[in-house]
Amino acid sequence: MTFPGDTAVLVLAAGPGTRMRSDTPKVLHTLAGRSMLSHVLHAIAKLAPQRLIVVLGHDHQRIAPLVGELADTLGRTIDVALQDRPLGTGHAVLCGLSALPDDYAGNVVVTSGDTPLLDADTLADLIATHRAVSAAVTVLTTTLDDPFGYGRILRTQDHEVMAIVEQTDATPSQREIREVNAGVYAFDIAALRSALSRLSSNNAQQELYLTDVIAILRSDGQTVHASHVDDSALVAGVNNRVQLAELASELNRRVVAAHQLAGVTVVDPATTWIDVDVTIGRDTVIHPGTQLLGRTQIGGRCVVGPDTTLTDVAVGDGASVVRTHGSSSSIGDGAAVGPFTYLRPGTALGADGKLGAFVEVKNSTIGTGTKVPHLTYVGDADIGEYSNIGASSVFVNYDGTSKRRTTVGSHVRTGSDTMFVAPVTIGDGAYTGAGTVVREDVPPGALAVSAGPQRNIENWVQRKRPGSPAAQASKRASEMACQQPTQPPDADQTP
């Protein structure tokens, strides 16, 4: 499914978006992991138009570099045209057409950069209908329960499109009309150029309205056609953050449903958020409160959640990830993570490995079958296969000026509360005793013990904390011990 070879597309993204009340340009606000402009350009790129032009104005210095990045991502050229003064949508189209050669003779699709649910099928249907009826212009329309803010479609008694009137210029009776302009058009370029040359700014906004082209072309006797979109969300625009949240929720509902239909169990769609670039394998179960963001990849037969957020994380088949926050990491096949686990960028857990409760890992590789069960920080480390890191262990990776790495071999067993003061290497098959502070390399098969014999300082509390609850408790315990009767010796032990 592609556009005909003579089709150019203009994306209007020059508006300041004042109703967003934001320092971020409106078209760069995000939903489902992409900016609004990115959603629109992805949909258009699927149809491979001959030319794709984005018209920028407000904050073009911030938006243009991102358009360039999107062009690289999409593998195609995207031109940028500049509207240097905010003189209306008609003027924006004139600016966009300046990027086309004067002898360009084809169809031009015009759309907005703030319609994030607009899809390739809707655009393809528009151009197909436009060509089928040989229209000078075909405009997408939809019907809204609350049409406030949209241009109204005016029709003749024969139901032909007569004009589009903007909200600010509409009469009270015209504002009752519920069929609205979706802001997406297909034009014959010659007819468009002719009509644009006759636009007037004699209106409430004192701007050149693209919508006035409809009435001009009709007065010329040209064919003006409308194509109605029943699913109004596909062409809904965003002017404020309420509308952004509403469309984000609707897009998420559609994304979740698509995964469900593909064989993924989503226990509670209302509390599950999945970005559009996320992939999930069959028979995976997603529990409530889960967010799968960015380019996260989940394998098949996994269990994810509840209360889990993964951003750009790759999860292998059959893995379990519970109450975990992770980013830019990988989890191997059959591995188990959570609950209350924090995976920071650069974490790579091997197949059948385990990262348990209250474990934080950063910039570390953990081998196949290795377990870090609980209460441990692993930073800047490489751990081999089938090792076990005891509870409350810490990889001490920062010396005050720089980060250092620790290497732990395979089949290593470390006692609870072991401190690895980097840089150190623990050889294959080595052990550490509980409470050991490892400051030097441990040879393969060795047992590292840093603590000396235990020494008890009698009556320390009584001397250092007299009268304290601890001192009183210890005094009572001592007195009770003194009152214990002495056991008489057994009869057969009497001399």
Curated annotation (Swiss-Prot):
It holds the Pfam family Hexapep. Acetyl-CoA binds at residues 391, 397-398, 416, 434. It comes from Mycobacterium tuberculosis (strain ATCC 25618 / H37Rv). Residues 483-495 have a biased composition (Low complexity). This is Bifunctional protein GlmU. InterPro entries: Bifunctional_GlmU (IPR005882), GlmU-like (IPR050065), GlmU_C_LbH (IPR038009), Hexapep (IPR001451), MobA-like_NTP_Trfase (IPR025877), Nucleotide-diphossugar_trans (IPR029044), Trimer_LpxA-like_sf (IPR011004). Residues 2-241 are annotated as: Pyrophosphorylase. Phosphorylated at the C-terminal domain by PknB. The phosphorylation is required for acetyltransferase activity, but does not affect uridyltransferase activity. UDP-N-acetyl-alpha-D-glucosamine binds at residues 12-15, 26, 83, 88-89, 112-114, 151, 166, 181, 239, 344, 362, 377, 388. Homotrimer. Keywords: Acetylation, Acyltransferase, Cell shape, Cell wall biogenesis/degradation, Cytoplasm, Isopeptide bond, Magnesium, Metal-binding, Multifunctional enzyme, Nucleotidyltransferase, Peptidoglycan synthesis, Repeat, Transferase, Ubl conjugation. It is found in: Cytoplasm. GO terms for cellular component: cytoplasm; membrane.
